[in-house]
Every structure is written in structure tokens, then in C-alpha cells.
Amino acid sequence: MSDKMKLTDYVTEFLQKKGIHDFFGYQGTMIAHLVDSIEHNANTKSHSSYNEQGAAFAACGYAQAKDSCACAYATSGPGAVNLLSGVADAYFDSLPVIFITGQLNTYEYSGIDGLRQQGFQEIDIVSMAKPVTKYAVQIREAQDIVRELNLAWQIANTGRKGPVLIDLPMNIQRGEVSDPVYDMKFSDEETEAAVYNRKDGGNGAAFYREAVDKADSADAAEAAEEILCKLKEAKRPVFMIGHGAAGSGEKILVDIARKHQIPVITSVLARSVLAWDDPLNCGCIGGAYGHRYANMIANAKSDLLVCFGISLCTRQIGTKVHEFARCAQIVRVDIDPYNLQREIHEGREGEKCFCVSAEDVAERLAAAESRISSYGDWLEVCRRIRRELTQVDNETPERYPNRMIAYLSDQLGDTGAVAVDVGQHMVWSYQSFHNKQDQKILFSGGHGAMGYALPAAIGAHYATGKPVACICGDGAFQMNIQELQWVKRENIPVKMVVMNNEALGMIRHLQRDYFDCVYADTSDGSGFSSCDFSDVAKAYGIRAKRIQGEDVENASGEFLEQNGPELLEIMLENGTYAYPKTCLGEPIHNQQPYIPKPIFDELMEI
């Protein structure tokens, strides 16, 4: 006789066997069977958010902090739709998350084409999710879950990782599954067809293969050999590491860089690859707000950029793409062939692309590292550039929030992860947060979703088992402020820092520069206002304190040393700014406020 089990019991057990023990979601009729199965499994726990978006961002934070798969769920209709911003966040930042939605009973479907809604809280969430998932499917027969769940898992966790969505009608949830399988494997052709069929209506795998073929090679050994040859010729090489090299790949690359004194520049999402004070750390590339020294080293000083899992999009290298690193050779390693279709050097002159895993290439480089020279003198040049340009920025009065972030980063201690929201505080944080070794800083990168940080920090706590922190602005914190109740209910040890300038500062800066200082909907008195967040936190039963920005060093230390959840609200001036900033049309290493010419000329000459 075949073994039989309830479908949602199988789903729960499958994910538990894969290492997922914490599930994030919000209860509802059409997802009740799944939640019941999670409750009855001795090795799993459901954590209820207060909006499904919070659950989705918690799953993103969990996946980022643990470098592994996460799961979030929601009921049908509005519950499922509320997940979508988190689904998009996982998609753009390559996070493997299994999203599960409840749905109307299949027997309630009318079969009438064009009917606006099949029943109460019914919505075609699969079609809505397809553009921001690697795979999305509705299960119409209970036994199909075995193949589809195994397939979805493999798709989420291989290649360029990302989210999948499984839509479960209520009657299917309570159905039975025969002969459950937990380790079904699929060929590359099967997974590619499943992922890419939606791109062109049926020839997805061929479409994907065509994109791969436009790279120079999909062979890791060939990519490693090209890099080794280029390193032999180079005098001023740089490793550029992005989120696509996350995990063991980045560790191997850092080890190689350390042994051979190769400077390392990262993307924002890969900001945690190196500790703040690591001698190899040459900052974060950024077309608008990157570190001055990173932008100068990459764009104007290096003669070889070896890029691992970094997209080199306009957000990173500026809008004048063909002018980036004109004097450098570029070798790009990326698992996503579509990223490699971005042409950096016009006509691909001095640019080689390899559609292959960064980890595979890193392993081959490590095996042949006796062929790599040491670049200690060049690293010293880069460290000098970092020191001198950091000093230039420290003398900029408008950067006082950066100094607060630097101080707070030392006060937050050994937090397992720090989630940062979207706004000016994000720039201040990735520019100035002094992260320790193995302390992760989490961002909503590609999607740039306000309201991300608090729930992401919650998810990171369950991923690491350690105290966590989040840094938010007054605009972003308001977006998912209801999750303070989640923090209180489960006594989550999260230190919340709200930097309150009573404005949407990033847009206010834009309005000052381009809209004649008309601050529509961004400032108090002009259509926007903020509350007293410390009072709100106290209403939830959470310890909270409100201080003025100039009092940070005197008033924050003892407060942040307490156990349990705490909120520190820091009042800033209304007119805050993020610097350095690249103006439209300028090279990314020539940011405002401009470097004094004698210093600029001297650094360009060394």
C-alpha cells in the first residue's frame, strides 16, 4: 500500500526537512489548513505578522541573514496581494523564498471566461506574481504537489536564486498525497523551461540558452584561466564582489584577495563581505552615493576589474555606462546571462563575460593561486585614497548624520544582523556603518521598498538566533509600524533606531535641486508629517527614548545596552542631505561637494 498524508502536512514536512523551521504569515480561512499543519509539526513554528507584507519582508530578512531558503504564506485575495511587494523584493535581490497562498476551492470556479471574479476573495495571484517570481503555479490536483513542490524548491535554490509562489486552493490543501517524495531532481533543461517559458510564451529554455550563448563562455575553467592571464598583466587589479557571489563564493574570493593583497570593492547588497576596518575594504561602488574612494579606485585608478556576481547597472556605475572604467580591462562572471547583455565598454572592447557561477570560478582560482602575484604596493595606494577621501568627507558639515551612524554602529554591539530601510538613512548607513566581521547589513536593494527594515530584522533574528537591529527614517518606519506588536508579542531583541527629520529627505533633496525648493508632500506643513515614534513604541509596551541629534553620544549608549526590544528616536534637522553625491552627467568619482583640486590631482597621479 502507498503511504498517504494530508497535503499541507506534506508541504510542512517537506520544508522542514529542507531546513525551514520558521514560517511567516497571517492566518485566514483559505490558508488555515497549512497553518494547522505547521502548528502540529513538532519541528516548525508559525510567526504571525500584522500585515502580510511584513511576513514577506521577514522571509526576505531570514533568507538574507541565513543565506538559505525561507517561507511566507497568506490567505487568498487581499492577503495574497499584500505579499507581492516582498515577493518583488526577493526577486530583484535573488533571495530564495517559497511563498504559499491560499485560494478558492476549485469546485467554486465557474469556468466562465471573462468572469471578473470567481468567488469571494478570489484573485489570479499566479498571473500577478509571474513577473516577479522564478516560478508560479496553482495546484489543481492534490498529487501534483509532489512534483511541483520539488520543482519549485530546486528552481528557487539553483542558478540565480529567487522566489517561487505556490497557490493552494482550500480543497486541495485538505486533500491527500500518496507516496510523498522529498528529493526529486530535475535536469537543467526542465528547470530552465519552467522558469523561462513565461518570457516568450513557450520557448523559454531556448530563449535562455540564446542569452547564455552571447557570453564568451559558460565554462568556469575558461573563466578562471582568463582571469589568471589578466591578473598576470595587471598592475592595479580590483575584485568587485556583488550579491551574486554571496555565500561560499565570496569567502573563497576574499581569501584569495587577502593572500595576494588585491583590493576589494563591493555592491551595496554585498556591503557585509568585509568588515569596515578590513585592510582590503575599498568601499561600496555607487553611481550616485557610493564611497568616494571606491568610485575613484574603480573608475579612474584600476587597470583591471574582476567582477563576480555584480550587475554593473546604472545605479552602480552611473548613467554614462560606456565611460565607466575606460582605462581598465573588465572580466565579468555572472550566473544571469541577461545581466551580461549589458555592454559596459562600447563594442565590448577590453571586456570579457562568462555566464557561470562565481563560486565555481572562485574554486578554480583558489586551486591555481600560485600563479597570482602579490599587489601590496597597489593596495597601499588604495588605502591612502580611502584615508584621504574619508578625511575630505568628514570635514563636510552636512554629513553629521554619517557620524551618528558610525557612533551608533559601535554602540549596537554584537548584533547578528542590521536591517536598513530605504531613504537618506540607507545612504548614511552603507557609507558609514562600522560593521564587524560576519555582521550582516541587510538592504532592500533592487526593489528599494520602504517599510522593509523592521520586519526584515525580525526575520533575521529567527535566522541567526541573535539580537538584531534596524535603522529607519520617519517615512519608512511608518510603512510597517504595526509590526511593533509582533516585536512585543514575541519579545524579539531588536534595537530600533528611527532617524526622524520630519521629512522624506531623499525626495526633499531632489526638490531642492530640481523643483525650485517646492517641497510638495515631503515636509511638515507641505503635505507630510511624522508622529512621536517613541510614544507609539511605548503604547505597544516597548521601551523607547527620544533624543536630539546632538545628544547621541551622551544619551544613547546606556539605553542601547539594555536587554530586549528598544526604540531610539533621533531628531534631526529638517534639511538633511546625503553626500557625497554624483551630479547628473559627472564621472562617478567626481562627486559633490567636490574634492579640493590639489588633493584630487595628487590622488590621480599616485
Feature locations, PLM:
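Phosphate/pyrophosphate-binding active-site segments
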Residues: S2-D3, Q143, T191-E210, A215-A218, ...
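N-terminal alpha/beta PP-like core and its mobile active-site loop of ThDP/TPP-dependent enzymes
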Residues: S2-E369, D414, V494-M496, L603
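Active-site diphosphate/adenylate-binding microenvironment
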Residues: T8-H21, Y26-M30, L34-E39, E380-A463
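N-terminal cationic-hydrophobic initiation segments that often serve targeting/anchoring roles
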Residues: A63, A156, A257, S409, ...
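Thiamine diphosphate
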Residues: P96, I100, E108-F120, G287, ...
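A structural motif corresponding to the C-terminal end of an alpha-helix
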Residues: V132, D303, Y407-G416, A537-I542
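Generic recognition of flexible, low-complexity loop/linker segments
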Residues: W153, E225-L228, I252-L253, R292-N295, ...
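Active-site flanking residues adjacent to catalytic metal/cofactor-binding acidic residues
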Residues: I166, F308, V333-I335, V420, ...
